Amino acid sequence: MVMLDLLSNALTAIKNAEAMGKRQVVIWPVNKLIYYTLRVLQRYGYVGEIEYIDDGRGGKYVVQLLGKINDIGAIRPRFPVKYREIVEWEQKYLPARQIGILVISTSQGVMSHLEAKEKKIGGVLLAYVY
């Protein structure tokens, strides 16, 4: 089976595990984009500890779930967004103004839309979570 979008597969695994009430999920295969996205989710309290296991086949992450995710998903296609356009995309993907985050890949790294607005930079939309 060919996996074309690893980030989408990882976020779907998290969503399904949360729906089943699991306490942890194993994400495999992995890459740096998945890791930095998970770090943003961890910083905002959506997931707990992230553990990397080197199995000799590219590794995997074991992510502790906290039961705080209602919906999570990758944004496809990955739209480029300017600093001033972030509010429009926030209204499109998030249920309310103060609920949830958009994950954005910027020239200064992967961060939430709140950090991008604070730093006044744009980037590429990767995912949403609330």
UniProtKB/Swiss-Prot annotation:
Source domain of life: Archaea
Coiled coil: none
Swiss-Prot/TrEMBL keywords: Ribonucleoprotein, Ribosomal protein, RNA-binding, rRNA-binding
UniProt KW Iron-sulfur keyword: no
Transmembrane segments annotated in the record for this chain: none
GO molecular function: rRNA binding; structural constituent of ribosome
InterPro entries for the chain: Ribosomal_uS8, Ribosomal_uS8_CS, Ribosomal_uS8_sf
Matching SUPFAM superfamilies: Ribosomal protein S8
Protein's UniProt keywords contain Disulfide bond: no
GO cellular component, one term: ribonucleoprotein complex
NCBIfam families with a match to the protein in the record: PRK04034.1
Classification via PANTHER family: 40S RIBOSOMAL PROTEIN S15A
Name under which the protein is recorded: Small ribosomal subunit protein uS8
Gene that this polypeptide is encoded by: rps8
